Amino acid sequence: MTVDTAAAGGAGRDPRLPHSADTVVVYSDLNCSFAHLAMHRLHEARHRLGLVGRIWFDHRAFPLELFNGSVNDRPGVDSEISVVGALAPAAGWRLWRSPDWTYPVTTLPAMEAVQAAKAQGWLASEALARGLRRAFWADSRCISMRHVILDVAAETSVVEVNELAAALDSGSARSAVMAQFESARAGRVRCSPHVFLHDGMNSANPGITVRWVNGDFGVGFPVIDADDPTVYDPLLRRAAELAG
């Protein structure tokens, strides 16, 4: 966990930081297993600490397909499920069970939908992001597809689906995704997930130390050398202090 106080102050405030003290920024991709784990633990910690309704999660796009110039390889994703999933089974994990040709080739439309849902409030964007993650990781649904995204939105019971559909059709949130990608590749966002607080405190892949053996992502498999799920409590307590 690091603190970058220079980025948090003055006229040159870092755009990667939250706009308000009561929000926690999380840069991530929806089909990143470590981000799925992190978001599950963030939600659990917020509930445990009694901070629901006081601290919000501002989802920012870290599009792996744009960083890598390719689809997030399914062999790599599959190799992570049993390893990362074992750290928090309740998050919802299953190997892909739908036909192979329905595996998501992109998560950009889904990430755009999460940004569009912010117009309806933090509750809506949080619920949609969590629903889309579960749709992919647990339910083997193709979150590349517009109708699947809207179905998931309807299932949240908090997202206004017609409003979201209009935003997707107009592309009103697409520029936000690309702006977040640009800010992420400028240097301070190291990976998916990377968590930022209003004062510059941040943590990349919180609590996890991981390495790949017998090949890189898509060839070998991950080994978790360290896992500390308690790191989320001090992060959220600090966010609550900043929020006042």
Tell where the protein language model's regions lie, with residue ranges.
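C-terminal cap of thioredoxin/glutaredoxin-like
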Residues: 27, 38-47, 134-244
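An acidic- and aromatic-residue-enriched active-site/binding cleft used to recognize and process polar
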Residues: 29, 62-64, 200
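Short active-site neighborhood of thiol/selenol oxidoreductases, capturing the structured segment around
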Residues: 18-33, 38-42, 57-60
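A short beta-strand-turn-helix
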Residues: 2-22
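Structural alpha/beta surface segment adjacent to cysteine/selenocysteine redox centers
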Residues: 37-140, 145-146, 234-242
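Intrinsically disordered, low-complexity proline-rich regions
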Residues: 1-5, 31, 51
